[in-house]
Amino acid sequence: MSGLLCYCRQGFEPELAAELSARAAFVGIAGYARTQRNDGYVLFVCDEAAQLAAKLQWRELIFARQKLVVIAELKGIDPKDRITPILAALEGQQRFGDLWVEHPDSDAGKPLAGLARSFGNALRPALRKAGLLTDKPQPRQPRLHICFLDGDHALLAVADSADSAPWPLGIPRLKLLPEAPSRSALKLDEALLTLLTPEEREALVKPGMRAADLGAAPGGWTWVLTRQHVHVTSVDNGPLRAHVLETGLVEHLRADGFHWKPAQPLDWMVCDMVEQPRRVAERMATWVREGWCRNTIFNLKLPMKKRWDETRLCLELFEQQAEKSLIVRAKQLYHDREEITVLAMRG
């Protein structure tokens, strides 16, 4: 078979399927999405998978944690010998720079974690013997993914390491430090890691920069910024954790973050307020249009129904009302729930 394999948050398969269908149609490639709710992945079946993968950059996909090009689908695999059919399916393929054996991040997929781990250890030497895997990981070469959907059912796929998530299952394993004021700190940590390239992070998040955190309490996002030695104005009528204020980098203003505006332009504005997504998109656009910040990261809380439609509408609304040349990226992060995280930076 030919197509794209994309992982997603369990329950968001319809949104990812709609996104892939819309984006494929936009670039003129015919295909269809194959999925079931709670699978944790979507297969977009098409004849021009490599061409579609090249046109749909991983960082531009909103609901996809990972993007892979499918090589083969194997069903009815003998549990006593899974290696032979995989080697046969890979005959004629180029040498891969690494191997990841995975499973969907879903209720049905998680019990396959043990199989994935042990089978990877068995498959690596067989691939090397067949000349299909380098002796050591080579990140510049394509990466082979084996995704077990069941003990006898697997998808074989390939990733371009420069255009795919650099973490197994597309999930960055971030640790919540004891001093973090809230779990929401992981959202901003992941956003900086996922939405910005290493070069962009180095250039755009520097010590001494100034930022605003709208709706800051109890201070999770503010705390993440102070760890980068950024000066933060935290705007919220609620209290911040004492140790966040003790950094000496934080000014706490007891005000409504939705209506406050800075006296001078800032490098960053971040916002994780619980509010209607269109209202948030419009307010964030005002910040950019008025020049109150150069760059922003904000969350949009999605409705229970028509989430892809609402996502597309909110992003279009934001870009139209911002009236600036912007680079906009959005992602449903692993640490997001019924929401997406949006990055907008000056182009």
Swiss-Prot record:
Gene3D superfamilies: 3.30.2300.20, 3.30.70.2810, Vaccinia Virus protein VP39. It comes from the Bacteria. It is an enzyme of class 2 (transferase). The keyword Nuclease does not apply. Keywords: Cytoplasm, Methyltransferase, rRNA processing, S-adenosyl-L-methionine, Transferase. It is found in: Cytoplasm. GO terms for biological process: methylation; rRNA processing. This is Ribosomal RNA large subunit methyltransferase M. It comes from Xanthomonas oryzae pv. oryzae (strain KACC10331 / KXO85).
